[in-house]
Amino acid sequence: METESEQNSSSTNGSSSSGASSRPQIAQMSLYERQAVQALQALQRQPNAAQYFHQFMLQQQLSNAQLHSLAAVQQATIAASRQASSPNSSTAQQQTATTQASMNLATTSAAQLISRSQSVSSPSATTLTQSVLLGNTTSPPLNQSQAQMYLRPQLGNLLQVNRTLGRNVPLASQLILMPNGAVAAVQQEVPPAQSPGVHADADQVQNLAVRNQQASAQGPQMPGSTQKAIPPGASPVSGLSQTSSQALAVAQASSGASGQSLNLSQAGGGSGNSLPGSMGPGGGGQAPGGLGQLPSSGLTGGSCPRKGTGVVQPLPAAQTVTVSQGSQTEAESAAAKKAEADGSGQQSVGMNLTRTATPAPSQTLISSATYTQIQPHSLIQQQQQIHLQQKQVVIQQQIAIHHQQQFQHRQSQLLHTATHLQLAQQQQQQQQQQQQQQQQQQQQQQGTTLTAPQPPQVPPTQQVPPSQSQQQAQTLVVQPMLQSSPLTLPPEPTSKPPIPIQSKPPVAPIKPPQLGAAKMSATQQPPPHIPVQVVGTRQPGSAQAQALGLAQLAAAVPTPRGITGAVQPGQAHLASSPPSSQAAPGALQECPPALAAGMTLAPVQGTAHVVKGGPTASSPVVAQVPAAFYMQSVHLPGKAQTLAVKRKAESEEERDDLSALASVLPTKASPAAESPKVIEEKNSLGEKAEPVASLNANPPNSDLVALAPTPSAPPPTLALVSRQMGDSKPPQAIVKPQILTHIIEGFVIQEGAEPFPVGCSQFLKETKKPLQAGLPTGLNESQPSGPLGGDSPSVELEKKANLLKCEYCGKYAPAEQFRGSKRFCSMTCAKRYNVSCSHQFRLKRKKMKEFQEASYARVRRRGPRRSSSDIARAKIQGKRHRGQEDSSRGSDNSSYDEALSPTSPGPLSVRAGHGERDLGNTITTPSTPELQGINPVFLSSNPSQWSVEEVYEFIASLQGCQEIAEEFRSQEIDGQALLLLKEEHLMSAMNIKLGPALKICAKINVLKET
């Protein structure tokens, strides 16, 4: 565990510190690691964690969201930039090099030190680690190496613990303990209220986001800037960086995404840090509000991105609006947006609207230690700007929480500035709309399709000559960071006119925002950074705003190419609530309220929406929203936009469904009038936020599926795809009622409808022959079904029962009266039958004896001599078969069996259970098998009167008993003794084996009967 944490820490932090130095540090962190484990165990469940933090906020007694004035922020940024100037100047010259700056800001009362130590790993992969060190003010500010010493092992350990727990849920809070610092819980995940767009894999986060959708409108909005999609090789920062980044407003949009990072409570420093330039197309994760897209720090350098200390990437238009969600949040977010819009030429306005404990119940954020956001501003085309912006990026804003009076004063200042910003932004938006309309007309006339112009991340800081303003293609890639799978949106060109969502070559060492700026400079004027609130996107040309829940289409998408916005909606819960869409007043002003509200899409977790625009025909942009199960098609004016839905690797089944879905969606466009109704449904469905497999279907990294554009209707149309919800549900097992099945040792046993079905195998076997004579054939035909499944109804069984006949008295009686083998209606009949059978058998024997005496010679000629072994065999078989019937029949006719035992004729299966048959057989065949094999001479005389010699002769006459006969002579056994012999006597006294003894006893029994 330690070694893994070492590797993660060293790789993410960069090669600045060697692994050797980190090992002893990790050994020292064992105590911290244990504490972290305890903290995790205490906060295993998000709801509990949310309550815990809410109580913690209340304990802090922080009344209103305490906002820091822009002036204070700027001063802090200037001081930080001066401190970081020397390392930044060296690295800033290298666009790909990460800025290495450690901000030592000692907070006064909060005693919170936010030190971001940035280490230069390689020109290709740069990491900027943000660590939140909570320490006492008395402790001296940490320098870069110290910060790394504490943060690296701690973050690594926390990540390891998180992995060992195997929890998809991001750590609710991570305790980063300074040696002398008070333990403060940095809340990473719980505050998703502000970050409804945070794409946390855990459903709990989504639930929180749903709860906090009310606050989502207030949450800072990520300007519609294209975030670099993670290169396929890059893995999004997992563990702290993803989870904390979501919880942390730090979510800095990677690669020029105007990084508005909510400084919600920066979770273990690595929260949405985006690799400044090394990211290349560096993967971007959505920031907590889905605003800042965390560049899942796909470190091309091969460093493990898992460490929470992700590289903060300077965002070209990065506005880190730490909007404390409160009543003020809307105004603050608007102000921040305006600041961003105004900051097209100016560097990002760091509005630290850190809300401390806003009473808003939905917000569980503990901003007790108001963490100011550090805004990494992506360096734009020129290295000079890079130096300036990197300085700001490295800005470690130390905001000392003094007195609430000061906070109130700052709040008033912020509100005042926000109003100015809003006014300025509105003006800028109007200008942009006019410019975009002109550009659209020019482009349509030219009919030129820009080949994959990098949709610049509408950074306000990007300074592009307005002459290049013809094409403003903005792609907003909102990629929810799934810890499990890195988002890899390959720049796969899908359709010729449309722009592949990530056209930037991943290999370009230039920082992605810079690349975007360079491309923009060539063909496009980046519109002032239009902050798109979590749900709203402003499409200036058509005054149509799509409020894609988190899936924010890049504002000012009016490029003739159309919106190349791969919108990977973060949490579907961010559900596109119409109020949230309207919450972005500046962005949505242009849009009629109905359209703006109507165009809210509940983003789907897994799906990346790439909206591609053809140069001429206007096609509805259909955004798949599996969570809301709505496809929203937006028509950008005069621009063909095809929505290519890219899906992260999830299931091939979903892929299969996509082709069908792609064909269906464009045809379903419904007039915009439906939008209000549909929106309400969306809001209800969005809360459910269960992505439908059929809607999510695109193979990961697979070619974008361009839905056929329907050029006709310009107004946005909403297509209900909810009907496929039923199709996507797995078929449920159909259980037959009232039939229980058991699988026992491989046998499938079904219980019958009745407890004890009358028809059973023994009953069938015993009653088949007698019943065939007197019963209708239907009885036997229907019986087999009874034992099998109880299929035959009870009525039919009752009919059968009425047909049962007693074998003795011949009466018909219901089956309930027939006990045991179902042969006799009562015990009396059974006993009488046994007695009568035995009596008749004796009479038969007497008659047979007389007949034999009368025809001695004839019997001698006709009766074939039968060996004693055959007779014994018949006897044994009779016993065996009779034993089987006795067990099934019961005790009612056991006496009858004993009566038949002496002369059971061969295998009893022949007699079919009827004494009458036996009598008939013995009468018609006087020489029964028992009599065969015995010399008729011995039968003619009385055995009880035999002498020893006669007994000797009798035994000698039996087959194979010549030797045994001598033993009888020696024992002086005469006729009477012979009749008394049993097998035990023969075996014990004479040492005769069991086989011969049984045979002899069988013959003796025959003599007894005669």
Curated annotation (Swiss-Prot):
GO CC, alphabetical: nuclear body; nucleus; PRC1 complex; sex chromatin
Subcellular location: Nucleus
Bias type Pro residues, positions: 453-463, 488-500
Signal sequence annotation: none
Cross-link (Glycyl lysine isopeptide (Lys-Gly) (interchain with G-Cter in SUMO2)): 769
One BP annotation, GO: chromatin remodeling
Annotated spans, Disordered: 1-25, 212-243, 259-312, 444-506, 565-588, 646-678, 772-794, 854-928
Zinc finger residue ranges, FCS-type: 797-831
Keyword ATP-binding: no
Protein name, entry field: Polyhomeotic-like protein 1
